[in-house]
Every structure is written in structure tokens, then in C-alpha cells.
Amino acid sequence: MKIEPENEYRDRRSLTNILGMAKRLLGVSIKENGVYADFTMGNGNDTLYIKKMCPSGTIYAFDIQPAALEATKKLLESEGCMDENVHLICDSHANFQKHIPENETLDGAIFNLGYLPGGDKSTTTKTSSTLTCLSGALDMLGPGGVAVVCVYPGHEEGAREGAAILELAEGFDRVGFDCLYHRLVNIPEAPFIVAFQKKIGKTPKFRKIGKISL
């Protein structure tokens, strides 16, 4: 599910283009025959981006709302990008391990938190399920794999998600992961990005901080 950002956050020429930055960061992980997850399918824009960047890749996309699957399928079909390697799944991203094979390794993952653009704003991503999914996805990342999370702290649940995700990122030892925090420092309520890249040839370690641990 995706929150509808203000127009300023869509301007490709602007530092506020959070979605464009997220795609550029995810692009680091793109490779032939890669395996990717869009954990907040929404209207399918991130799924489409991944498929266009990696036509030979496998994509698992998740959303709890049937309308999101319908919109995404329609978008991909209109672009000639819907094939047997694109899996649109109507389920919580917290349950992703039921749908992605246990022996699969993710090359990249993206989260665009919040609610479905044009949809019911009371149906939004939740901190508990987001952390469950993100923790599992990070564990499933292969060496060099990237997970990118767009956070929208302008609403109550988004602020909780953001605080929890930052706490998670700050808890990783530098040996196993590089963790990036990207935001506008003079707009407290502006969307921001937390990105994770699993280091090649390293074993991730985690320092417990507060109530969060892996």
C-alpha cells in the first residue's frame, strides 16, 4: 500500500523527489535474472519499474487490497510487462514467506509505506507487520542485495513506523549491513528513506536497541 505524496515529492527535478531517489537506490541491486519483492504493491508503479529494469527477473508483489492487484495487473499488461515471472499476491507482506520459496534469495526489495493512493486512508501499513516483513526480507537478501523503505511520518502510524525502522537500522553492526538514512532536514513531516545493503562476504550482526531485536 502506498501513501499519496504531495506533488512536490513527485518532481523529478527536486530534492524532495523521494520516490525517484528510492528507485535509484533500488537500481543498485538490479541484475539479470534477479529476484525482487515489492512489499507494498499499491497501484503497481514500483513493480513496473523493477520489471522494466530487469525483464528477465522474478518479482513477488504484495498487497492486502484486491483493488491494488487489479490496478497493478492492468498497468503491467498495458506496458507489456505482465508474464509468468510476475507474482501478484493478495496477502499481508508479513506473510511473504508463505509465498516466496524458502530457498529463494532476494536481490532487492522495496517498501512504499502508507495507504493506497485513491483508496481508503484508514487502511494503512502497520508498524508490527512492516517490521516483521522487513526483518524477514533483510534475512533473505543475498550479498549486495538492497532493501529500500519509503516512510511517511506525516500521519500517526507513519511516524511510529519511521521511528521503529530507524531504530532497527541503527541496531545493525556495520560488519554485515550498510544502512542509509535520507531525508529533508528542515521539513520534519517530509517523507524519508531508510535503505539497507547486505555486504558481500560478511555475516550480518545486530546490536539490540530498545525493544527491537532480530
Predicted feature locations:
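S-adenosyl-L-methionine
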Residues: 1-37, 45-52, 70-104
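Conserved beta-strand/loop positions that form the S-adenosyl-L-methionine
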Residues: 39, 62
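Conserved S-adenosyl-L-methionine
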Residues: 52-58
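Mobile active-site "lid"/loop adjacent to the S-adenosyl-L-methionine
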Residues: 110-133
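Conserved beta-strand signature within the Rossmann-like core of class I S-adenosyl-L-methionine
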Residues: 140, 144-151
